[in-house]
UniProtKB/Swiss-Prot annotation:
It comes from Escherichia coli (strain K12). The zinc-containing form utilizes only the (S)-isomer of allantoin, whereas the cobalt-containing form prefers the (S)-isomer, but also hydrolyzes the (R)-isomer at about 1/10 the rate. Induction: By glyoxylate. Its EC number is 3.5.2.5. CDD domains: L-HYD_ALN. The gene is allB. This is Allantoinase.
Length: 453
């Protein structure tokens, strides 16, 4: 058989092993894995490189439509491709209107036409004002529903995202359980975090350490514990977003051991930045839950290596620079990290701490694809989409602002020496990013809908 593409001589991350093997691609799908596969129209030599499944980033904010001056599809998905991401799962907030019904998600689809460099799945929102319309988003094909039990949204904007109270969460989780949809939750105690934050502002405590102190670990743990129980009673599958503390992970592990259907994610910034670095970097490193101290970070690494965290995500949530101005307590909370997930975590987890390549592949791609039902994604296996990223190990570079593809070329990772590089990203058999050529093809990304899997 003649193939469209054969990738030769790379160390390929398979589901339970990594070995030097060739991959054949035909019609955008992985057709064969082995040696001496035959002829192809194109042959790529991946000698000395790690060939990973393209990253499935399960937590991305693209603020188009309505706030494309924060981040748009064109810039955001180019940054993703440059960072080795081939599929993103897009959050239902930051854009206006928030993605909370059929009309708003159709606006997303229209806004993205001709702009997607990578593939994208969508999450719907569970908010205080759409509980009777959740079925609309399920019918369109979202892969889950996101909600906040922490305070969120601009009360002065009618169609912005909104947090839910316990009653709204419970009723929404009941409906989502009936629909077979997971609920994803931002877990922080709203009232306590809000009051601690206001108290700090009144007293003039506005440093990074003060911000972290205003959102202590117990506020995350309490919220996780609460939504775990409510989701269990409601009969809904739960995914806990961006867990920032070992204690928070322990709550998920305990529930899982008791038989509850629950998963969790975390983000690179909780593993590679600490509060002292946050103080030095400033508002670019502000997020919620916040970046915590070094002891907390060490505990997170232990949980990651123990297999208690299901997937790693960017939580890419940028904004215009003026929203990061001023003191840390007032600045927008959100990190621009889409482009730096794979290389930073390959360096920190694999090269510096000895994580196995199969575990890396599961954390960056396979598990997220499984959690959200992306059946064609996340694995290098025959029949799956031919989505790959080439990683050059032990190849250090210093990230600069000019390297970034974001709408606003800022990130807390700028200035960091990263010990591995993404050299090529392939989506369904086509090179969408190359370290030498840039972006050689027009945007070919597609939306992935649940019912079309």
């Amino acid at each position: 058989m003649s193939f469209d593409l054969i990738i030769k001589n790379g160390t390929v991350i398979l589901e339970n092993e990594a070995r030097v093997v060739d991959i054949a691609v035909k019609g955008g799908k992985i057709a064969a894995i082995g040696q001496d596969l035959g002829d192809a129209k194109e042959v790529m030599d991946a000698s000395g490189l790690v060939v990973s499944p393209g990253m499935v980033d399960a937590h991305t904010h693209i603020s188009e439509p309505g706030r494309s001056h924060w981040e748009g599809y064109e810039t955001g998905t180019r940054a993703a491709a440059k960072g080795g991401i081939t599929t993103m799962i897009e959050m239902p907030l930051n854009q206006l209107p928030a993605t909370v019904d059929r009309a708003s998600i159709e606006l997303k689809f229209d806004a993205a036409k001709g702009k997607l460099t990578i593939d994208a799945a969508q999450l719907g929102g569970l908010v205080s004002y759409n509980i009777d319309r959740l079925h609309e988003l399920d019918e369109v094909g979202v892969v889950g529903f996101k909600c906040f039990v922490a305070t969120c949204g601009d009360r002065g904007i009618d169609n912005d995202f909104r947090d839910v109270n316990d009653w709204q969460f419970f009723k929404g989780a009941q409906k989502l359980g009936e629909l077979g949809q997971p609920v994803l939750v931002h877990c922080e105690n709203a009232l306590i975090c809000d009051e601690l934050g206001e108290e700090a502002k009144r007293e003039g405590r506005v440093t990074a350490h003060d911000y972290v102190a205003s959102r202590p670990v117990f506020t995350e743990v309490e919220a996780i514990r609460r939504v775990l129980y409510l989701a269990k009673v409601a009969g809904c599958r739960l995914h806990v977003c961006h867990v920032s503390s070992p204690e928070g992970v322990e709550e998920v592990t305990r529930a899982r051991q008791e038989g509850q259907d629950v998963t969790c994610e975390s983000c690179p910034h909780y593993f590679v930045l600490d509060t002292d670095q946050f103080e030095e970097i400033g508002t670019l490193a502000k997020c919620s839950p916040p970046i915590r101290d070094l002891e907390n970070q060490k505990g997170m690494w232990e949980k990651l290596f123990n297999g208690e965290i299901d997937c790693l995500v960017s939580d890419h949530s940028p904004c215009p620079p003026e929203m990061k101005a001023g003191n840390i307590m007032k600045a927008w909370g959100g990190i621009a990290g889409l482009q730096s997930c794979m290389d930073v975590m390959f360096d920190e987890a694999v090269q510096k701490r000895g994580m196995s390549l199969p575990m890396f592949g599961k954390l960056m791609a396979t598990n997220a694809a499984d959690i959200f039902g992306l059946q064609q994604k996340g694995r290098i296996a025959p029949g799956k989409d031919a989505d790959f990223v080439f990683i050059q190990p032990n190849s250090s570079y210093v990230l600069t602002n000019d390297d970034l593809e974001y709408r606003h070329k800022v990130s807390p990772y700028v200035g960091r020496t990263i010990g591995a590089r993404i050299t090529k990203t392939i989506l369904r058999g086509d090179v969408i990013y190359d370290i030498e050529q840039g972006f050689p093809v027009a945007p070919k990304g597609q939306f992935i809908l649940k019912h079309q899997q």
